[in-house]
Amino acid sequence: MSSWCSSEDAHNQSSTPSTRSRKSSWLISKIDENEIDKEVQEMMDDWRRSNEAENHVECIKAALEYCRDKLKELLIDEEDTEMDGKETKTKPINIVSNTEFPEDRDVLGNLVNCLDRQQKAARQQMYFDKIVQLGLERQALQDEAVVSTSSPLDECRAEGHEFVMQPVRGGHNPCCEVCMHTIWRLVQWWRRCRVCGMRAHDKCAEEVKRVCAGVLSTRAKFELNTNLCEERSLAEQEYQCAECTAPICFDGVAEQEARLCDYSGELFCPNCHWNDVWSIPARIVHNLDSTPRPVCRAVKQLLAIIDHRPLIDINESTLSLIKFHKELRRVNELRRNFLLMKCYFVSCRTARRLRILQYLNAHSHFVDNSVMYSPKELRELCDGTLLPDLEQIHTVFRKHIEEECETCAGNGFFCELCDDINVDQKNKILYPFTENTRSCATCLAVYHKKCFERKSLNCPRCERRRKRTEIPKTLSSSDEKEAVRN
């Protein structure tokens, strides 16, 4: 009995793992998601080796034909299987050596058939997805080829606009800003100005009457309007649109509705005013009001182009605003500190190697002056997002100068006007951007504000320099007297 048991155990040990492994392999058998990609990629590599002179678009076309053929084979195989129906049944694989449970064979056979159908359906879906992916890739390459190989004649110029032909593919169908009809991308050629973004049919591009906003913003006499404009009446405009002179009114049909542009104060027709909204620079400057308000298409394109340009002088226009607005005062203080810190970074080899001024890359004009702002920066100031960013950059700059860099720290100052009683205060290193300090306007030496005012604004460093310049004069005068005596 022991031998029988041992042989049975050996039989179970030898047969059970293989049976379990085969069952598990059928139960979890799935198509690898990358299998089709690898198969198509190998086919494309073979095609490139045999067709070296062809371009990538032709290779994608060959891959598309390959995927279509494979998908067609799977569909034909599926149709044949459905026609056979119940007449042809797949024989179940003999998994268990003994035949005590014959009904298990039918169950496993049906399971194999079901998994086989699922695998074929999965492969069909993967080939279909690959066909869609390759088709989109081929269309993108063709569109790029059209744009990149376009000659100067393909660029249409009118009223300063630089209209460039656009590809057929896209997310939505835009509206032509000349004829006001929809641009059906699949059946109509259309162009877009590379400067201001104006869109028009290919046939309408030469009929544009609006001057490009990029041309207006680059003129020598261009100035951003920072004055609040009064609303003009229909009578002042002779009941005409301020741009295209089309008839407008308030009580007529929708096509003649008069729409106000808050930037210029003029009235426009619906073709020239699409109810676009934008923050008005004049309201930001005078009221710190960044609420978007309706503007016409021309103004919207202009404000979008100059949004990052430093065109607004806060010191000249709104001195009272700086006085009563706490955040604006702090921003002006940080900007003055940036200019002082720039002097340290220019003479520091480590700062140049780290390119530490790149932290102000989004505000590059901050290292040139402390008064000019762009409309976008003033809008961020009103929203409360500008000041935290500048505070963070200021902390990084100050940490480099005071703690991390010995070269920058060595260019600090000691207050020479402090009393000997305050030893800790006297031995503290001061910098031009340190709080409660004053700098001499002549030699730029830094002192505590209270000490400098207590000494009647007298700078000991300037006094030493003045004495050193007087010594050669006294020596030269004494030499002249001795020469006269002799």
UniProtKB/Swiss-Prot annotation:
Zinc finger (Phorbol-ester/DAG-type): 160-212, 393-459
Record flagged with keyword Amino-acid biosynthesis: no
Residues covered by region (Disordered): 1-26
InterPro entries reported for this sequence: C1-like_sf (IPR046349), DEF8 (IPR051366), DEF8_C1 (IPR047983), PE/DAG-bd (IPR002219), RH_dom (IPR025258)
Keywords, alphabetical: Metal-binding, Repeat, Zinc, Zinc-finger
Source taxon at top rank: Eukaryota
CDD domains: C1_DEF8
One Pfam family this sequence matches: RH_dom
PANTHER family per the UniProt record, alphabetical: DIFFERENTIALLY EXPRESSED IN FDCP 8 HOMOLOG (PTHR12326:SF3), PLECKSTRIN HOMOLOGY DOMAIN CONTAINING PROTEIN (PTHR12326)
Family recorded in the similarity comment: Belongs to the DEF8 family.
Protein name listed in UniProt: Differentially expressed in FDCP 8 homolog
High-level lineage: Eukaryota, Metazoa, Ecdysozoa, Nematoda, Chromadorea
